[in-house]
């Protein structure tokens, strides 16, 4: 069986994602397409607009055969760590190919990944505080390999390639040309494709959802209209309270709170009247907005280095949904994988020290804002066919 994996957030799922699912299956001649999808929090440190179960069902409705959750410890990380967790999970699921969108589909990612892992380790030398880590890494790659990585999906593709090259048995890499809208585009035009960030902006600004009907499937439009959406504005009062109430010593214990960043948080928090104002006040040449957003989320959820270290050691496969073809693969996977396959969360699993302890803890925040239980009493979605799915 030919199995192709896709790494995604679907925040939210739109026409560009459907195109990628179709092209991944077609170009790799896949019998099965598995999506490794971020849970309720995404790579840039934000809560997803829609919960993971809704997004998984939308993926199944639009071409995925199986959807598994990328754990928080990998999902809310810089590109290299995000890629490592996702690629390793897809390899464990039996994928032979990883498909991803790229602005440079003819680029040889396979070769670049191998070249990069053969380079000497340089990250410790990136100490220019007038530049972000990503900028310094890009300059290093350009100097050593003449690689110019100035587009977000190209950077992610390189990260996938490096993580893949480190596998004992690397997978095939399939870069699919992005259609029209680029990652980060902030406008929705009359074209059938728009970036996820442009779509989120329409939703969060209160614009009529009818403006999106030509760029998202009907299921996404209905979910956005019917679901309880979780935005930064809703989380802001709680984040402000957390920053103001924690001492410097306590802030210093937060994951990725380094280089004296805790002092900056304390200095600017009293002047900030919104999440956006806080980020603008925190921003320096050293930190990207994505890095600051992740740290804010770590503060909000009280994520400490030990949480991440323990989470990375608790490897498992968390099923969110599958169709009949995915179910057939699941039966075979149970015979071959050493990883626990989780379809139901028991009280023991969900305890603080349990296999899914961290996921249960971070998802509780979403549940406080009206989302249904995200772990207990939930079963994987079995998608039978068009417009029919059962949990």
Curated annotation (Swiss-Prot):
UniProt keyword list: ATP-binding, Cytoplasm, Ligase, Nucleotide-binding, RNA-binding, tRNA processing, tRNA-binding
UniProt KW RNA-binding keyword: yes
Keyword Amino-acid biosynthesis: no
A molecular function (GO) term: ATP binding
GO cellular component, as recorded: cytoplasm
Highest taxon above the source species: Bacteria
EC number: 6.3.4.-
UniProt subcellular location: Cytoplasm
Enzyme category, top tier: ligase
Binding site for ATP: 7-20, 101, 153, 178
Major subcellular location class: cytoplasm
Reactions catalysed: cytidine(34) in elongator tRNA(Met) + acetate + ATP = N(4)-acetylcytidine(34) in elongator tRNA(Met) + AMP + diphosphate
An example Gene Ontology biological process: tRNA modification
Role this protein plays: Catalyzes the formation of N(4)-acetylcytidine (ac(4)C) at the wobble position of elongator tRNA(Met), using acetate and ATP as substrates. First activates an acetate ion to form acetyladenylate (Ac-AMP) and then transfers the acetyl group to tRNA to form ac(4)C34.
Family per record: Belongs to the TmcAL family.
Protein name as annotated: tRNA(Met) cytidine acetate ligase
Organism: Latilactobacillus sakei subsp. sakei (strain 23K) (Lactobacillus sakei subsp. sakei)
